[in-house]
């Protein structure tokens, strides 16, 4: 997830951890550690260049610091840094307990949130080096910003603090709405939900308001997770008559603040034909409310209309055929490509490039693109993550 979401979760957890006994003087300390801990796993960006690009960013971001073992190490490091602060040492034992629990939960929240989208994490390394993909949330989710932002604004101790929390969120939400990436009905729903939440929680205490915000956010996330399961089944059923081989993966990404609309990439292995096929389209979970053609977003830069398959909820926009032999040869003989395949989930080879269809529909447009050219030596410091597409390489 984006760092705005991580930070707002850290603020809400801090207000919740303070409880009724927290003082005005303690809030900056609690909020500070909540925000720092909620973002600290992204410290891996600082050392991603120990491996040349693009491999360094692909393999080190969401790398070791996004594992359970890494979180323990970060907790010890952050705890050591805060332990000697006079303001922490002067706390009562109950206050210190809440402070350390806040730090631990905020750290864990980062891994939990990052596990919910199609980018993936590998939390159980080194015991298990496999990637886990939640396929349930877009990396930017304005509904989470709205609820958590309202709580953060109301919980500000002064009018200036409330304005400082509310104004950037309002500008950000309006900017995103103006791009057209969020459909009009979602913009209206967000505005109503934000106003309703602000009205309901206006007279609540800070920690109760934070608890309410976290509860609403949990329900939103649960709704996306549940809809993701429905979307996956709908994709499998719709594509069944089209497929000649084995479906090895279904990649799902919802449109921002629109759980009815999903970007879909299904990967089919056709061993007998010596190829794998990537089926790319848009799905409307409920076509009576939203047609697949109306679900187009920034993720599809081609024509809005696609071939409708199945029961009418899935519109296919691209069918990309890829040679298995070339992919397997690259994995066997090119150590740079083999390192890239420790990240790539939807690999597409076009000309002298390889890129991930999750992030672009052509080479040279985004961070996963890598040129397939002769290089001296192999990339250094390549972590031993599992290959998402090992099922195509066997």
PLM segments and residue spans:
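N-terminal membrane-targeting hydrophobic helices
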Residues: 1-243, 251-254
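Extracytosolic and intramembrane catalytic regions of membrane-associated proteins
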Residues: 244-250, 254-394
């Amino acid at each position: 997830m984006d760092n705005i979401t991580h930070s707002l979760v850290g603020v809400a957890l801090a207000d919740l951890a303070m409880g009724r006994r927290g003082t005005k003087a303690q809030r900056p300390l609690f909020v500070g550690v909540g925000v720092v801990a909620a973002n600290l796993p992204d410290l891996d960006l600082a050392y991603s260049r120990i491996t040349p690009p693009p491999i360094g960013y692909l393999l080190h971001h969401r790398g070791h610091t996004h594992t359970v073992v890494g979180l323990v190490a970060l907790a010890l490091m952050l705890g050591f840094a805060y332990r000697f602060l006079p303001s922490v040492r002067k706390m009562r034992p109950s206050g210190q307990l809440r402070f350390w629990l806040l730090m631990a939960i905020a750290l864990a929240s980062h891994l939990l949130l990052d596990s919910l989208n199609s980018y993936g994490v590998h939390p159980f390394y080194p015991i298990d080096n496999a990637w886990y993909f939640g396929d349930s949330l877009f990396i930017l989710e304005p509904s989470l910003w709205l609820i958590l932002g309202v709580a953060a604004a109301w919980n500000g101790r002064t009018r200036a603090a409330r304005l400082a929390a509310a104004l950037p969120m309002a500008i950000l939400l309006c900017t995103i709405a103006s791009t057209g990436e969020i459909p009009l009905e979602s913009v209206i729903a967000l505005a109503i939900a934000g106003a309703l939440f602000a009205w309901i929680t206006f007279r609540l205490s800070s920690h109760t308001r934070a608890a309410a915000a976290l509860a609403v956010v949990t329900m939103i996330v649960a709704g996306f997770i549940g809809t993701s399961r429905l979307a996956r089944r709908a994709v499998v059923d719709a594509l069944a008559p089209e497929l000649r081989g084995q479906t090895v993966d279904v990649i799902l990404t919802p449109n921002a603040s629109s759980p009815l609309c999903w970007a879909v990439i299904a990967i089919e292995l056709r061993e007998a034909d010596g190829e794998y096929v990537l089926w790319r389209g848009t799905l409307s979970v409920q076509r009576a409310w939203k047609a697949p053609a109306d679900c187009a977003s920034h993720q599809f830069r081609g024509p809005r209309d696609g071939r409708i398959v199945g029961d009418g909820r899935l519109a296919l926009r691209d069918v990309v055929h890829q040679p298995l032999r070339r992919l397997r040869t690259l994995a066997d003989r090119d150590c740079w490509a083999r390192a890239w395949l420790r990240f790539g989930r939807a690999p597409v080879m076009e000309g002298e490039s390889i890129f991930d269809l999750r992030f672009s529909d052509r080479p040279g447009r985004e961070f996963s693109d890598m040129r397939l050219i002769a290089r001296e030596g192999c990339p250094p410091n390549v972590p031993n993550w599992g290959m998402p597409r090992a099922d195509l390489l066997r």
